[in-house]
Every structure is written in C-alpha cells, then in structure tokens.
Amino acid sequence: MRNINPTDTMAWQALVQHKAEHLSIPQLFAENEDRFATYNLSFEDQILVDYSKNAINQKTLTLLRQLAKECDVDGARQAMFSGEKINRTENRAVLHIALRNRANKAIFVDGKDVMPAVNAVLAKMKAFSEKVIKGDWKGYTGKAITDVINIGIGGSDLGPYMVTEALRPYKNHLNMHFVSNVDGTHIAEVLRKVNPETTLVLVASKTFTTQETMTNAFSAREWLLADAKDQSAVAKHFVALSTNSETVAKFGIDTENMFEFWDWVGGRYSLWSAIGLSIVLSIGFANFEQLLEGAYAMDKHFYHTADEQNIPLTLALVSIWNNNFLGAQTEAILPYDQYLHRFAAYFQQGNMESNGKYIGRDGKAVNYQTGPIIWGEPGTNGQHAFYQLIHQGTTLIPCDFIAPAQTHNPLSDHHNKLLSNFFAQTEALAFGKSKAQVELEFTQQGKSLDEVKDIVPFKVFTGNKPTNSILLKKVTPYSLGALIAMYEHKIFVQGVLFNIYSFDQWGVELGKQLANRILPELEDDQPVVSHDSSTNGLINQFKAWRE
C-alpha cells in the first residue's frame, strides 16, 4: 500500500474549496425532484442504499472519486485481495475475504495457498456441529447438549453474538450464551442458567492466553468439575477455537476438538472463521454457508463494480465528506429491526478499532481527522432517547438507517408502524420544519401568532442533517452476510484514504500492560505508592473498602 497523505492531493484541496458552496439537502431536492433516482444503489435484489439525503451533488462525488484514485484505493484493494501483507506493523496479510471465498480460487500467503486449510476447518466445523445438533455428542453423563456457552472477548464475542441474535429466526433447539467480561458476574449469571451435564463451552482465544477469556474459561471448568468430579469430563464439554495446541491440551481439551484460524484473520473480522462455530451451532451449517455466500457476493461487488455503482466505496466517500469536510466527528447506526440490536455495537468495534489511529502509514502524526465515533441503538427505542440531539442539537451526526422490508414476525400492523418511523425520521432530518411551518400549524389550531411567538423557536427543526437509508428485502443469512461485508469494505476504504493501517490495534495494549502491573499490587493490603496520586488513591480506597 502506498503512503499518500490525503490532504496533499489535488482532490482534497478541491473538496476544501467545494465545501464553501454550503450545499443544502432541501435545496438539492428542490433543484432535482427525482434526486433519489440518481443517488441510490442496489445490491442484487437484496439491498437498496439511498444516499440522496446527504449534502452532496455530482461535483462532490466526482471530487471524492478523484480522491480515491489519487490515494490509490484500487491498488490497496488489489493488494488485500491478493494476499499482500498490508498489515505492515504486524507483517500480516489481511484475508478475511479468503474465509468466504466460495469460488475456492487459490489465494496465496508466503507462497502457500490458504484455501485447503480454510476448507478443512469448514469441513471440521460442519461435522462437529451436526454431531452436536443431532444429539450424537454426549456430555459426561451421556446426555445430549442443550446449551452452548461461547467464551471470548472483542471479535471472538461481538461478531458471533451479533450474528446469532440477528438470525434468531433461523436458530435450532440449542440455547446460545455469550460470556466476555472478566467481571465474575457475567460468567456467574450464565452458569446459573445451565446444567453442567448438557452444556458445551467454546473457548475462543487464538493464543489461549487472553486474560479475560481464560479467566472465564477456568471458572467454567471449575464449575463443571465441581459437578462431574472427573477431569476427563472437560474433554466432553469444552472445545477450543485456538492455535495453541499445547496449552489447549493442558487445559484438558482434546486437540481433535481444536478449531484453528490464522494470523491473517483479524479478531474483528473473524466471525467467518472458526470463531463462528457458535453461529454454526445456532443456525446450522447450511445457513452459515449462506452467510458466507452473501459476504462473498459483496466481496465480488466491491472488487469488480465500477466506482459509480460501488456501494462500499460510495458509503466510505460520503462518510469522508461528512466527517472531514462538513465537521461531523461521529456516525450513528440505527437499525429498525430488533434482531439487529447488536449491529451498531459490532461495527463500533469494527470501525473504531480499525480506524481510530493518529499515526499515518508514514509513521507521523496525521493533520486531519481519522475514524469517527460509531454508536447507535435500534429504532424506535432511540427516538425516545437520543434523537432529540440528532434533530436539534449542535453536533452534526450523520446516520445510517437500516430496515428490512419483510419481517420475520408479521404481528398486526407492527411492521408498518416501525417502517413509518424509519421513513419519517430521514425525511425529518433532511427537511426539518421551518418557522413559517410552525406558525402555520399554530394558526390552524386557532392560536394567534402573538400568543405563541415565544414557543415557536423551540419547535423549529433546521433539517439538512445527512442520512443513508439502507433497505434490506429481509434479514436472512445471505443478506446479513452481504450487509456485514459492505460495512467491512467501507471501513477498509476509509482507512486507505486516511493513510493509516486499519488492521492492527496497538491502542488496546497499553491498558493491558498496566493492568498486568497493577494486578500483583492488589493481592495484599499494603498501601500502593508506585503510581500517580490519582491511581494510588483509587487503588488504596479499593483496598480499604473490599471485603
């Protein structure tokens, strides 16, 4: 990947000048009544992306696409898909796309085709999951498995949890549970719900040394052995998603039940790998394959589709415009589908851990904003929580609204009411409500302007708030796979344009190092004086109060 500061490009300088035109969303619609036709993109018969409610015109898009060319997005894309080690700080390839390479085309890393290993793990996941789902896998008392606990953190938890929740309409009889937090409350509450005789535990840690994951795994093992009283029971109730066979075996897990993945799979892109075993156990391997198929279809779209019709590229460019030129520092992801209630949290990690960097690929601090803050909640809950600030606050918050046209639960008129809010919110954010409209409403209610003049300003909505509307035909394994891959590739493009390395996460390391230093200091009651006064004071108060 080339090292190109985006602010040095001709396109960036032209965009700075273009910003001074102060484009207005209502005005853009007034100038082109059929604006939607020009500013929407479709993916197969599955996803419609309407980006017309952004403050952009054809000049904006032309300049943004020129920025992508000057920053060599195409070259970076080819480098990723061909297995080049674009994660330079860790000297690794970035090949989550290989995990869903349904054409089985050879992809090489260090001269070795990775696809035979990928296919072998998939075959192993299929065979294992079918055994558990059919009831042929027995616990230590000979009973079939009824509950599965996935113990992981970060990508080993967020992705599988998000997908299993999103695809609950496709789940089988197995009950899925997810434990991530090292807070003992998390594992304790889950263990209270399950029977050790019929519970299978997946321990998801590449190194099998992750502090939070292994702390929870050892607690789960103690819980099992308190009931089984036989070390051999561990092998019947635990499997590993790991590459550290020696440590896995020491834990008591049969290495035949160890599912590997590779250093070219980043944690936040790992749900497509063995880390997705909990997904397979929840919805079955055939549905997991459809998830892979959907992602693969989006991979092909991203790789082959021209810039003008390329959905991930377009979304990334619009985001760059909103954040780097219009001054937004955040983006909200707002799914109008309860099954997608963890989607925003998943891409909070996906985006912020990827692009929350201040050092460019040249090793120097950047002089522009990089990754935005990502957050969100399902609609319509958010409307009664934080939409007030989006509509009338002083911070510009671009929003992605996501909704399915078809629901899995057609109860009464629930879905029409839900979607009426989905459509209304983007209209309200784009066009707002003027002072004249507010005054007219009061007049129609029989009130004089004199008696309402003091309240009128509070009911004005300025509008001109940018949104994307992402309409799915239905949330299925296939469409969800495509949707996830769409956001993955958007994040990739943004990282290329930001001139940063999107696939490392050094920012998580310092806190872990300091925690490892502090942990031994908590083992006695001696006052701590080795830190700054604030940290010393907090530790010493903790010691005074703990039981």
From Swiss-Prot:
Enzyme Commission number(s) of this protein: 5.3.1.9
Pfam families: PGI (PF00342)
Annotated metabolic or biological route of this protein: Carbohydrate biosynthesis; gluconeogenesis; Carbohydrate degradation; glycolysis; D-glyceraldehyde 3-phosphate and glycerone phosphate from D-glucose: step 2/4
Compartmental location: Cytoplasm
tRNA-binding in keyword set: no
Any one GO molecular-function label of the UniProt entry: monosaccharide binding
Active site: E353 (proton donor), H384, K512
CDD domains hit by this protein: SIS_PGI_1, SIS_PGI_2
Catalytic activity: alpha-D-glucose 6-phosphate = beta-D-fructose 6-phosphate
UniProt keyword terms in alphabetical order: Cytoplasm, Gluconeogenesis, Glycolysis, Isomerase
Primary site of residence: cytoplasm
UniProt record, GO biological process: gluconeogenesis; glucose 6-phosphate metabolic process; glycolytic process
Record PANTHER family: GLUCOSE-6-PHOSPHATE ISOMERASE
Protein function: Catalyzes the reversible isomerization of glucose-6-phosphate to fructose-6-phosphate.
Family to which the UniProt record says this protein belongs: Belongs to the GPI family.
Listed name of the protein: Glucose-6-phosphate isomerase
